[in-house]
Swiss-Prot record:
Family: Belongs to the aromatic-ring hydroxylase family.
Gene (UniProt): tet(50)
Keyword Iron: no
Lineage of origin: Bacteria, environmental samples
Key word Oxidoreductase present: yes
Protein's recorded name: Flavin-dependent monooxygenase
Annotated catalysed reactions: a tetracycline + NADPH + O2 + H(+) = a (1S,10aS)-3-(CONH2)-1-(Me2N)-3,3a,4,6-(HO)4-2,5-dioxo-1H,10aH,11H,11aH-cyclopenta[b]anthracene + CO + NADP(+) + H2O; 7-chlorotetracycline + NADPH + O2 + H(+) = (1S,10S,10aS)-3-(CONH2)-9-Cl-1-(Me2N)-3,3a,4,10-(HO)4-10-Me-2,5-dioxo-1H,10aH,11H,11aH-cyclopenta[b]anthracen-6-olate + CO + NADP(+) + H2O
Class in the EC hierarchy, top level: oxidoreductase
Activity modulation: Inhibited by anhydrotetracycline.
Species of provenance: Unknown prokaryotic organism
Function description: An FAD-requiring monooxygenase active on tetracycline antibiotic and some of its derivatives, which leads to their inactivation. Expression in E.coli confers high resistance to tetracycline and oxytetracycline, does not confer resistance to minocycline or tigecycline. Degrades tetracycline and oxytetracycline; the reaction requires NADPH. Degrades and confers resistance to chlortetracycline.
Entry-linked SUPFAM superfamilies: FAD/NAD(P)-binding domain
Length: 388
């Protein structure tokens, strides 16, 4: 029965290809669409942690992830004058333990897409209308084409257009945690060699790292602010806000910002959580950041995507395609795991971005040890069902 169930998956990030993989493996017929012209290269580094590591191994992609993992050998905290405060080895600096690995977002998506090479995927495509009834979901695409599907799974990120089309505003909350994050690539003008530098002061954080591409460096900014942008998606407003927020910050900040116009991969967003009582409505389900973003600072969004994809597809298999039963179980099984990770996301948002008088070697070490312990707990705070 399952092979005749046609499922549209919206979004080629991490959650979309992951759920498509498990749907195909469990006998369904998924198809993917993505509004971008191609898979976005590079991007921020993501962690494969805890139970998600087990899922990656089950998918047969863990060794590929290890082969393409980041290779930061040293992390170094500096003050606004450039003095070294604290130094840690790469894995400890990234809060990774045992067989956990870090990989660039673009590299992970590339691995996932190769794992589902036989699944139809259409780029430069998006949905402008969704209508559902007892028997199917009718989808209208931006090019005017109309298609019917048995189910739709939306994995189109924290600013999910699907969520806005299907769910009313009182069915979800975007919780602003009071901070912003930005990242972009610039030339490796400091000559960093598999190293990350981190400068934290006055509720602001600037990072600079260089890994496998010796001529390039990834700059990162995080900062607290009560200011609300008029248009969170306006890149010029974002860049102006970033400049204004880090004026006279010190260290290499101005040199980094001066090189920002050279970058072609500028990213900026508010540190936000998505809260929903139910991630499903009728024949439509949300997954990944579209459903339960825990906050970019938590580093757990990738793991929620892996676990959510496995459970959603697995419950559909277990229910032999009975989406009502499967969606109910998806919500029941995943909610405690999501809540634990979102609580951790709030804690990280509050514990990072310290005041001037709080930044020290002792504080940095104590915070790292606490984060390591908490990550290990929340990353493994679910017992995965067996569907095969």
């Amino acid at each position: 029965m399952t092979k005749h169930i046609k499922i549209l998956v919206i979004g080629v990030g991490v959650a979309g290809p992951a759920v498509a993989y498990w749907l195909k493996r469990f006998g369904f017929s998924p198809v993917l669409i993505e509004k971008s012209a191609a898979v976005r290269k590079g991007g921020q580094a993501l962690d494969i942690r805890g139970i998600a590591t087990h899922i990656a191994k089950e998918m047969g992609i863990y060794d590929q992830i290890c082969n393409m993992r980041t290779q930061i050998k040293c992390g170094r905290y500096v003050d606004v004058k450039g003095n070294v405060l604290h130094e840690e080895q790469g894995e400890t600096f990234g809060f990774r333990q045992d067989d956990e690995v870090e990989i660039l977002r673009g590299d992970l998506v590339e691995i996932l897409m190769k794992a589902i090479a036989d699944i139809p995927c259409e780029f430069k495509q998006s949905v402008i209308k969704i209508e559902q009834n007892e028997d199917s979901v009718t989808v209208t695409y931006k090019d005017g084409r109309v298609e019917n599907y048995d189910l739709v799974i939306a994995a189109d990120g924290i600013h999910s257009a699907t969520r806005g089309m299907v769910f009313s505003k009182n069915e979800y909350q975007l919780i602003n945690l009071g901070s912003y994050v930005s990242a972009f690539t610039i030339p490796n003008y400091l000559g960093l060699d598999h190293m990350e530098l981190l400068c934290e002061s006055n509720h602001k954080l600037v990072t600079l790292q260089s890994d496998s591409q010796a001529d390039k460096a990834m700059a990162g900014f995080m900062f607290r602010s009560k200011h609300v942008l008029e248009d969170i998606r306006d890149e010029q407003e974002q860049k102006h806000f970033l400049h204004a927020s880090f004026q006279n910050f010190g260290w290499e900040t101005q040199n980094i910002l001066n090189r920002m116009p050279e970058s072609d991969d500028f990213y900026f967003d508010a540190i936000t959580q998505i809260k929903m009582k139910s991630w499903t409505k009728g024949r439509i389900a949300l997954i990944g950041d579209a459903a339960y973003c825990p906050s970019p600072l938590s580093g757990q969004g990738n793991n929620l995507a892996f676990v959510g994809a496995y459970i959603l597809a697995g419950e559909l298999k277990k229910a032999d395609g009975d989406y009502i039963q499967a969606f109910t179980r998806y919500n029941e099984l995943l909610h405690p795991f999501v809540e634990a990770n979102q609580q951790f996301g709030v804690w990280v948002s509050e514990s990072f971005l310290l005041k001037d008088d709080e930044v020290s070697k002792e504080i940095a070490e104590a915070r790292s040890n606490k984060i390591l312990a908490m990550i290990k707990s929340v990353s493994n705070s679910i017992n995965l069902p067996q569907y095969e």
